[in-house]
């Protein structure tokens, strides 16, 4: 595993930790934004099985469906709408990059342009 000058792994996932101990189990309470399943369904239909950022096909799931992830371009937590004008279907790589990547702002800007064009059709 590649280690940087601070002693951290160069590679991370959503569960990254600097400690090498087994995780402890604990109960978590919180709030979640309610999402409209009709928006998700319409966005996935619009994408027709292709990432709306890179146009690559989603992968096939065990039950034969095409997998993409729906992404709120302007997050709900930042007053973004749960509407097809603000939601894109992305491959898992670009969905994670849109949240955690160095290019997240560029991806957001490109997705906003793409969604605007699709609304004009």
Regions found by a protein language model. Give the residues of each.
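Short helix-coil boundary/hinge micro-motifs
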Residues: 1-2
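Short, charged surface segments at domain edges that flank catalytic/cofactor-binding sites
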Residues: 7-57, 81, 112-121
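Divalent metal-coordination and catalytic microenvironments
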Residues: 43, 72, 91, 95
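Short pre-active-site segment immediately N-terminal to redox-active cysteine/selenocysteine motifs
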Residues: 50, 87-90
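Cys/His-rich metal-chelating microdomains
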Residues: 54-60, 93-97
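Histidine-centered nuclease catalytic patch
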Residues: 57-87, 108
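Glycine-rich loops and low-complexity Gly/Arg-rich segments
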Residues: 76-78, 93-97, 114-117
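Short Cys/His-centered divalent metal-binding micro-motifs
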Residues: 89-106
């Amino acid at each position: 595993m590649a280690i940087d000058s601070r002693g951290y792994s160069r590679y991370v996932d959503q569960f990254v930790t600097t400690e090498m101990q087994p995780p402890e189990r604990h109960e978590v309470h919180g709030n979640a934004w309610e999402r409209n399943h009709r928006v998700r369904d319409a966005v996935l239909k619009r994408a027709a099985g292709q990432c709306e950022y890179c146009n690559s096909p989603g992968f096939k799931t065990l039950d034969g469906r095409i997998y993409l992830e729906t992404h709120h371009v302007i997050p709900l937590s930042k007053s973004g709408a749960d509407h097809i004008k603000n939601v894109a279907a992305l491959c898992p790589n670009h969905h994670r990059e849109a949240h955690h990547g160095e290019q997240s702002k560029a991806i957001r800007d490109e997705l906003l342009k793409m969604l605007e064009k699709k609304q004009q059709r």
